[in-house]
Amino acid sequence: MSLEIARNDGVNPVVLKVVGEFLEEIGSRLDKGQGLWLAGGVGAGKTALAMLVSKTAIEAGHTVAIYSLPKLLARIRATYEKDLGGDSYTQFFDRLISVDLLHVDDLGVEKRSDWVLEQLYSVVNERYEMERSMVVTTNLEQQALEDQIGERTVSRLVEICGPPLTVDGEDLRYPRAPAY
């Protein structure tokens, strides 16, 4: 998705302006540890806009890690399986923290548990302390996200990303779905 396609799909012009400015200033924004938080309904274009940010960062020579939250949590769990020959928890965590931009999609879809809350807080807090950028997407409003992942974690996300940008509208996937 490009900003022009998003504009034609009816994405909120204010959101497009903020995202466009972020893209134009990608280097300085990442150097400052700034990010974006995109919230809204299913299929509204959040992931596409976040991918545009990640793609622009990569094209500008920055390091980026892109995960859906379920995949990120599964990857963290896999670090506990020492006999699989993968990264240790510390190695993987250090990579998550060291990339210029961490892109986490579908924040809030995870089943809430103490372990999940601990992992999310650890990643977000460490990136907050190291002034590292994040772009996150969620279907939840801020209060619902606080209820799901904790007020401390959301507070740090607001510090990194600013308040959520609401990407609203109809599910853009339906008009593109093939007719049978």
Where are these regions (language model features)?
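Pre-Walker A (pre-P-loop) alpha-helix and adjacent loop at the N terminus of AAA/AAA+ ATPase modules
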Residues: 5-36
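P-loop NTPase Walker A phosphate-binding motif
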Residues: 47-62
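Short glycine-rich substrate-engagement loop in P-loop NTPases that contacts/grips substrate
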Residues: 11-16, 58, 62-98
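Loop/turn-to-beta-strand initiation segments
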Residues: 62-63, 98-101, 128-136
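A short, basic N-terminal segment
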Residues: 1-17, 164-165, 175-180
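Walker A/P-loop nucleotide-binding motif
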Residues: 32-50
